[in-house]
Design a protein with these regions (language model features):
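Charged catalytic cores and adjacent phosphate/nucleic-acid-binding surfaces used
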Residues: 2, 85-93, 127-275
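Short glycine-enriched loops at secondary-structure junctions
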Residues: 76-80, 124-127, 177-178
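Generic beta-sheet signal
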Residues: 116-118, 171
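A metal-dependent hydrolase metal-coordination microenvironment
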Residues: 1-114, 121, 143, 150-151, ...
Length: 275
């Protein structure tokens, strides 16, 4: 997909394939072993807690990423009931196994305690509005949120851009992919969602600095959204103006606008159709 960076953020509270994997490995595990607390989105885990190694997906991704020159951002998705609580990505985590707490707010605090940046995922998913429920009021009020997803899959939340501006959050666009990107995007003629991060390089340190400085834009289905000045800077860096001919009788010019980027721009005059 032409990516430089990939964030690995498996669900903490929802791990639907654990039971199937245990069945597949029944000769290697004690008879009667069952998945434990593998769906605790709407209820708390019991005293046994989470048995899985939540750091393993990051480890596996890093091993494969070396073959492709990809940088892996370690993370996890804190996944609670979507309307009252919502979903949150913890990025740059150091130990995903220490994130979970029965109190969702404490889970976010646990992420911040290990230096993670927390992104509010798909804030309009399954909701009728982007108004803050009580949990979000507390989470934002404590300064636990660093970024917000304004595009997720085929969904776009324009009002989240205003929130990002007001609360000084970085913006992002993500696939939230649970299948192959070729199936979901490429075979339908689309490029995958992605976040454009204006970093000095693709090291974890440079990426984190860019996110903290909010130098990001969101791309989805041919649309780029985010901070107006960053959008202007991207366009002027991509498109050049070249005068091809000047009519000496009236001064009219014929110009070309070569686009040096891989982004397709559509030009419109105010109130008119595309040029």
């Amino acid at each position: 997909d032409g990516l430089d960076v990939l964030a690995i953020t498996e669900h903490v509270e929802y791990r639907r394939h654990e039971g199937k994997m245990l069945n597949f490995l029944k000769g290697y595990v004690p008879e009667g072993t069952e998945a434990i607390n593998n769906n605790i989105i709407r209820r708390s885990a019991d005293e046994r807690g989470i048995q899985s190694d939540l750091n393993l997906p990051v480890k596996l991704a890093r091993e494969t990423a070396r073959k492709y020159g990809l940088t892996i951002i370690p993370g996890a998705e804190i996944t609670r009931e979507p309307i009252a609580y919502g979903h949150y990505n913890a990025l740059f985590t150091t130990d995903n196994n220490s994130l979970y707490a029965t109190d969702a707010l404490q889970s976010l605090r646990n992420a911040k305690a290990q230096g993670a940046l927390v992104m509010h995922n798909h804030p309009g998913w399954r909701r009728k509005s982007l108004e803050h429920p009580e949990f979000e009021v507390k989470a934002y009020g404590e300064g636990l949120i660093d970024g917000i997803e304004i595009m997720n899959g085929a969904e776009f939340y324009p009002k989240a851009i205003a929130r990002a501006h007001a609360r000084k959050l970085f913006v992002s666009a993500n696939t939230d992919i649970h299948d192959a990107t070729a199936e979901t995007y490429r075979l339908q003629g689309h490029s995958r969602n992605m976040t454009l991060i204006f970093a000095r390089n693709n090291s974890l340190e440079a990426l984190r600095e860019a996110l903290e400085a909010r130098r990001t834009l969101a791309y989805s289905f041919g649309t780029i959204a985010g901070d107006e000045q960053l959008l202007k800077d991207l366009f002027t860096a991509s498109v050049r103006t070249k005068v091809l001919h000047t009519d000496p009788s009236n001064g009219r010019r014929t110009v070309s606008l070569p686009n040096g980027s891989s982004v397709e721009y559509v030009l419109r005059f105010p109130g008119q159709n595309r040029v």
